[in-house]
């Protein structure tokens, strides 16, 4: 009886409300209870307590385990459901959420629904922009302010830079010519890094059209060490550019990019710029590529472009292309949970239950829009009550008014999935094969039809989104696909409309998948088996010492199995508690459906084709990373990107292995040649006349500085630092990242150090007398640091030495921090940061990785 069920829900609501309002738990209490909830999974428990348990501004914790959180969410969604016909009860909703089994609100909805301790949005992501002409300084600063205002409310932000004039364009101010895109990329990046979000940095996506004359500078911007570190960058590629790049033809850039009669045009060699995109992606994983014509052609909201729904950029992870001032909330359906008898010969996918839950997921997402509108009303009320004068508050207030209008008018949702990799394995299908891809396509077609059918049903009960117009949409390729697959659904939609302008996405589900204990999004398993290390006391009983570091600390290596790999083992009679040899582990993996189906060894071209086939049933986009081994060449990246474009993908990102090797240790056995015993590093006291050198730029207070790091056999041997400006400092093109430091002796015996570099055409330029550029105080400290580098003190110890210098001058201390950052990039990946504790989990398990500190226990990272 639904009335009885609703009554139970109300009882739970009162109980949970009292817990949330009155009971305060210590971190240890919440962690221990969550550890029991996740059946001993320390990482899942820690992530939940740190990121998702309700806390007030003093750090008091009001939820003991995810059970409390799920009741909090269920009660709030049930409150909205009670406003509409056939409302779901809190108990019915709780059963969908419990243990992250079926439906999982992601990120901001999980944290914010029913949370009265923070005034924040429920939206995961936003896109902002300016209507009309937007190339003025005022427009650029306006975007900067809006970006910060959204990030302080937990939102990730995306915006496009194609409206900014190219470098050298005439402007009617004291500068006379435009500075171009790159300085503003740095500005927006710095703003992102300033905004703390519960200890996180802000998330930012910057995009630009390949048609923009400054797009090459945009593509290169992050290749300079320390530049634009607070943003992801993606380049919007149109079909004309891709065709020209593939065929080796010229391509015309212009500004404004959409003008029929542009003020500026430039013909370029498309294949040369394409090679640069490929090279940079191969080297640094950026820029990502967005196939913009495909995005616009397939976009249902762009059928209403003239009403304010013209897509201009994407959210930071790329799965939601958005128009200015629209936002989206995310939810994932756990695909693994619909496999009956997983990993058994009679395993099958329960499509009947799945279809029912897809409809409910879309319904819950629509309820969350109502909850979001309430949250925005609360944000605007707080702005009104803040003591600042109206002029100061106006920009933030107007921003939220625009978002409120777009959210209510279009009612956009982001229903997605997670655990695709585990679902396929549980059915005995190998990720990346044709058979697996066909099944995935069937699943995502079911999601699309189910979500749109649910949206049409809600239109009958609750009303369609207010600007729905069938005639506008009738030629949209996605809508035509739905109509062909389900004519009855399309007929109903024409008659009643639908509740939501767009419904679907596939987002990365990083922390979500930790709590579902599955693979992430549509990705394959990263590793089915990996190793971690923990420090042990060798005198304790039952301790197995596998590794002793140079300080004498003992460590035990232990095998960690992917959760669903354990399920496969148990289903096939293998004991997960046994201590296996490396050979036995290799044999186990080879017998499992995860064999040759990990992120590093899946068939990459097939993965791209799979993404394209699934994309046909996702109205927004898909966030996917193609993980590649370190030794692949640039040609493979080229082939993957071209295949992604041809297959109908809306975007693509590649990531070459190496950036997180300090977190997970592959258990693959590799025979290595016997190395001779270690010997002390060779000290070269007589400096060679010429040393290769890296150029590292950094900020010292408000001044721009540059460091020249001389290298001997790849190891830092000396460091020179100085101002970088046009007058008395060092004038050096931004494109210069390496060169040579040459030691010269003048006729009077005076030593001099010169820096020499080559430009793109091979011509050499020499900057004489580096030491003459220095303040003597900096020069003396640089000599000290160079001395310890020359005698091969370990880099991490040099950094510790520099950090311990007690200096009175604030500018010297800022310079010191810049030197530390410059040297960190030379620390060997995996080097332990001794004596440092992870600020996230408190363990002394930090290692250096590409100049950043990464925790091998919880995965937290900190750079700079």
Where are these regions (language model features)?
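Single conserved hydrophobic/aromatic residue that forms the stacking wall/gate
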Residues: 1-12
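Conserved, charged catalytic cores of large soluble enzymes
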Residues: 10-87, 173-187, 197-309, 340-344, ...
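Catalytic alpha/beta core of large soluble enzyme barrels
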Residues: 42, 318-320, 372-373, 377, ...
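Function-dense linear segments that define catalytic or interfacial modules
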Residues: 76-82, 96-173, 181-184, 195-198, ...
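Internal maturation/activation junctions in enzymes
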Residues: 93-94, 254-257, 357-404, 408, ...
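Terminal amphipathic helices with adjacent charged low-complexity linkers/tails
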Residues: 237, 298, 303-305, 315, ...
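Short, Gly/Pro- and small/polar-rich lid/capping loops
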Residues: 490-492, 666-711
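Short, cysteine/histidine-rich loop/knuckle motifs that typically chelate Zn2+
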Residues: 839-843, 857
């Amino acid at each position: 009886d639904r009335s009885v069920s609703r009554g139970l829900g109300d009882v739970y609501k009162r109980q949970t409300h009292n817990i949330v309002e009155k009971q305060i738990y210590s971190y240890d209490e919440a962690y221990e209870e969550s550890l029991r909830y996740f059946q001993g999974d320390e990482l899942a428990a820690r992530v939940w307590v740190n990121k998702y348990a309700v806390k007030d501004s003093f750090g008091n914790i009001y939820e003991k385990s995810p059970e409390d959180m799920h009741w909090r969410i269920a009660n709030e969604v049930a409150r909205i459901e009670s406003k509409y016909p056939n409302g779901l009860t809190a108990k019915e909703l709780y059963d969908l959420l419990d243990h992250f089994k079926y439906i999982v609100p992601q990120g901001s909805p999980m944290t914010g629904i029913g949370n009265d301790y923070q005034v924040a949005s429920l939206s995961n992501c936003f896109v902002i922009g300016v209507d009309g002409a937007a190339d003025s300084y005022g427009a650029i600063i306006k975007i900067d302010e809006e970006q910060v205002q959204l990030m302080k409310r937990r939102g990730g932000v995306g915006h496009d830079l194609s409206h900014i004039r190219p470098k050298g364009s005439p402007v009617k101010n004291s500068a006379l010519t435009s500075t171009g895109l790159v300085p503003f990329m740095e500005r927006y990046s710095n703003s992102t890094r300033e905004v703390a979000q519960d200890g996180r940095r802000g998330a930012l996506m910057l995009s630009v059209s390949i048609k923009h004359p400054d797009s090459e500078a945009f593509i290169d911007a992050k290749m300079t060490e320390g530049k634009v570190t607070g943003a992801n960058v993606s380049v919007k590629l149109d079909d004309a550019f891709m065709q020209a790049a593939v065929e080796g033809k010229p391509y015309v850039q212009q500004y404004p990019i959409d003008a029929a009669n542009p003020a500026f045009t430039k013909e370029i060699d498309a294949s040369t710029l394409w090679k640069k995109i490929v090279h940079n992606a191969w080297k640094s994983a950026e820029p990502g590529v967005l196939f913009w014509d495909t995005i616009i052609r397939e976009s249902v909201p762009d059928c209403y472009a003239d009403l304010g729904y013209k897509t201009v950029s994407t959210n930071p992870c790329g799965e939601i292309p958005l128009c200015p001032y629209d936002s989206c909330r995310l939810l994932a359906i756990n695909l693994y949970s619909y496999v009956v008898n997983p990993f058994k010969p009679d395993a099958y996918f329960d499509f009947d239950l799945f279809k029912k839950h897809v409809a409910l997921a879309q319904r819950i997402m629509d309820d969350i829009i109502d909850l979001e509108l309430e949250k925005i009303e609360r944000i605007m009320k707080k702005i009104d009550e803040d003591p600042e004068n109206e002029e100061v508050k106006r920009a933030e207030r107007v921003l939220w008014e625009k978002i409120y209008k777009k959210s209510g008018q279009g009612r956009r949702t982001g229903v997605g999935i997670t655990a695709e990799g585990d679902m396929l394995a549980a059915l005995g299908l190998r990720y990346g094969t044709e058979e697996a891809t066909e099944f995935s396509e069937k699943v995502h077609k079911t999601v699309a039809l189910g979500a749109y059918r649910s949206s049409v049903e809600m239109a009958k009960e609750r009303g369609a989104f207010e600007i729905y117009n069938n005639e506008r949409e009738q030629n949209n390729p996605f809508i035509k696909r739905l109509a062909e697959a389900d004519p009855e659904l399309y007929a109903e939609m024409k008659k009643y409309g639908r509740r939501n302008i767009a419904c679907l996405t596939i987002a990365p589900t990083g922390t979500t998948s930790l709590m579902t204990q599955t693979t992430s999004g549509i990705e394959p398993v990263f590793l089915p088996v990996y190793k971690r290390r923990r420090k042990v006391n060798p005198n304790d009983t039952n301790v197995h010492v596998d590794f002793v570091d140079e300080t004498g600390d003992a460590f035990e290596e232990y095998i960690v199995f992917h959760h669903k790999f354990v399920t496969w083992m148990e289903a096939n009679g293998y004991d997960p508690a046994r201590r296996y040899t490396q050979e036995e582990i290799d044999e186990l993996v080879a017998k499992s459906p995860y064999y040759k189906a990990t992120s590093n060894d899946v068939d990459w071209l097939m993965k791209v084709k799979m993404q394209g086939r699934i994309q046909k049933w996702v109205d927004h986009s898909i966030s996917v990373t193609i993980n590649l081994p370190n030794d692949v060449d640039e040609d493979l990246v080229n082939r993957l990107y071209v295949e992604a474009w041809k297959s109908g993908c809306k975007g693509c990102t590649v990531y070459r292995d190496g950036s997180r090797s300090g977190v997970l240790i592959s258990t693959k056995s590799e025979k290595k040649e016997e190395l001779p015993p270690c010997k002390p590093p060779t000290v070269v006291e007589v400096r060679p006349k010429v040393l290769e050198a890296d150029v590292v730029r950094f900020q010292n207070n408000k001044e721009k500085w540059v460091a020249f790091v001389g290298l001997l056999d790849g190891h830092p041997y000396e460091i020179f630092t100085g101002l970088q400006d046009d007058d008395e400092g060092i004038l050096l093109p931004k494109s210069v990242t390496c060169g040579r430091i040459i030691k010269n002796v003048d006729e009077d015996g005076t030593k001099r150090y010169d820096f020499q570099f080559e430009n793109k055409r091979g011509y050499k330029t020499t900057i004489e007398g580096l030491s003459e550029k220095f303040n003597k105080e900096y020069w003396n400290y640089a000599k000290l640091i160079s001395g310890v580098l020359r005698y091969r003190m370990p880099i991490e110890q040099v950094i510790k030495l520099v950090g311990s210098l007690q200096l009175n001058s604030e500018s010297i201390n800022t310079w010191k921090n810049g030197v530390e950052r410059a040297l960190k990039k030379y620390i060997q990946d995996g080097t332990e940061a001794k004596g440092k504790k992870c600020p996230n989990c408190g363990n002394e398990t930090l290692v250096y990785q590409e100049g950043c500190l990464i925790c091998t226990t919880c995965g937290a990272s900190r750079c700079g």
